[in-house]
Structure formats: structure tokens, C-alpha cells
Amino acid sequence: MRFTQLSALIAAVALSVGSVSAFAKPVQLTDTVGRKVTVDLPAKRVVLGFYYQDYMAIGGKTALDNVVGFSKAVWADWAPPSWAAFSKAVPKLNQLADVGEVEVGTFSIEKVLALKPDLLVLAEWQYKALGSDLDRINKAGIPIVVLDYNAQTVAKHVQSTKLIGTLTGQQQKADKLAADYKRVADTIQARVQKANLPKPKVYVEFGNKGPAEHSVTFGKSMWGSMATLVGGNNIAASSVEFYGPINPEKVLAAKPDVIVITGRETELKKNPAAMVMGWGIPKAEAEKRLAGFAKRAGWANLPAIKNNRLYAAYHAHSRPLSDSTP
């Protein structure tokens, strides 16, 4: 059984920034859902919904100077060690107002409005989930810019990166980061094409529930898109649009050649069998938990298990611009 651990601290606090004009001017942008949005830049009071590390890495060490609020739980609750490290290195994070979290239903339009922002930045999944709740934001004349790193496509990563560059006044840096990302993706795809091997059937599962219960898999987003990008045949693509459960019998019937179980730090003390990966996770602990998934009913006969191609990956390394780093 082989084991892969992906974890990296984006050196946002080490990045320098150039001068930004003090006078705001209207700039029209096209966001990742194709909306034409006019924003007065530089924005002075920004509320961020997600993609904080990317915003900081692109915008530099003063990127948060004009940020007044964010959805704290998406970072602090989903990746506590990452939050602890960043909030210590960047004290401004502790001063930002918390507007709640979309996925658990605590996101507060009232809290957003109370901050009197001149820009709201959301992930596409947040924008879609909030739906008509955003009417009040629109009526207040607050522009909303939608980003999408979750799609995990080169096009959306590049577009989102360049949008952040425009919003933070760091277009040149954003262009370089976007070009670097595309170069890495193109190199991977060129190598896959040159190898000219049969596409392995791939199954990826978020291992937060442990071996006893199947959790979500990924279709055309996150790990599903990554599997496709690197030349795999994602067995969930025809059953799951973005992410969601799949019938365990379908996994057995598909006979995947490769299985990837993703994990994070949060489950370390919550569930003794759940997959854990990331900051401060002992390798032996992660390997022990990964081995538990190989013992699922029927899995012993799968090609992935027979051929020792069961892997673990850090769940938080899907979505960010840094997903191309080793």
C-alpha cells in the first residue's frame, strides 16, 4: 500500500505588493458564472466567502487591509491547523467579522449588510446555494464577484486567479501564477498523452465517515475533475454531477484500477476510523486508517486493492491554486 501526503503552507505573508491607486474607478469584470459585474476598484470594504489563501497569495501581504468580513467556519472549522498557523502569522485574520457559513445555514445577509461592504466575493457553490437570498445584496447596490476553484479545471483556475489579481490590484502577479498553473497542467497532460497508456478507472472518496459508511465521491468538480485532468477515467462522472454519494454496488461493478481516499485533520478525534491527512497527522496513523478501507466488503477483489493502488490524499489540497504543488 502506497501513501501520498500533500500539505503546504502558502507563503502569503511573504509576498510583496505594488502600489495601488487611492482613487476608486469603475471596472467591468466577467466572473466565473459569466456575469458582467462593475466594481469600483480598489475596493475598500470587501467580504470574502471562500478561497482566502488564494486571495492572500495573489494579493500579497496587504491583501487583507481592505477586507472587513469573511466566512470563518469554512477555514477555522474545516482546517483548524491551517487556520491556527495562518491566524498566528497574519493577525488581521482574527480581526475580521464572521458572517457565517453557507453550507450549515448560518450565513447571515444581515451581518454582511451591517459591514457596509463595497464588494462581496463568493465561491460559485456559495452563490448558487444562497440563490434569492442575495437579492438584498443586489438591491443594496453591492457588487458580487463569483470565483470557482472548486470546478478544478485549468480554465476556471486561471480565470479565478486573474479575477483576484484585478480585485487586489495585482494583475501582473496573477498572470504569472495563472501561467505557471497552466504550464504544470499542460506538462502533466503532455506526459500522459506521450505515455499512451489505457486510462485507469479511478474512484475517489472523501473518507470522513470511515470504512463502515460510504461518504461522498466527486463528479465534475474537485477530485473528480483532477482525476480526469491527469488522464484517469472517473467512475463517478456519469452518476454524480459535482459531489455526492454513489451506490457502493456501482463501485464494485466498475472495478476501479485506482482508489483515492481523501482525509483531513478534523476527523482525528471525531472518528477513530475516518481517514486523516494533513498538518500534524502522523504517517503511521494515516496508514493505519487507510488500511481499514481496503477491508470493506467486496473490495479485496477490486483491481486497485489487488495491485496495491489504494492511496490517501489531503482533502484540502483540492480547490486551491496550490493544488499543482508537490
Identify the residue ranges that each predicted region occupies.
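Short helix-initiation/N-cap motifs at beta->coil->alpha
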Residues: 32-34, 96-108, 239-248
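A short, structured surface patch at a secondary-structure boundary
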Residues: 49, 54-111, 119, 124-125, ...
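Structured C-terminal subdomain patch of bacterial secreted/periplasmic proteins
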Residues: 100, 152-168, 179, 190, ...
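Proline-aspartate-enriched helix->loop->beta-strand connector
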Residues: 101-104, 108-125, 142, 248-264
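Alpha-helical, coiled-coil/dimerization segments enriched in small aliphatic residues
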Residues: 215-242
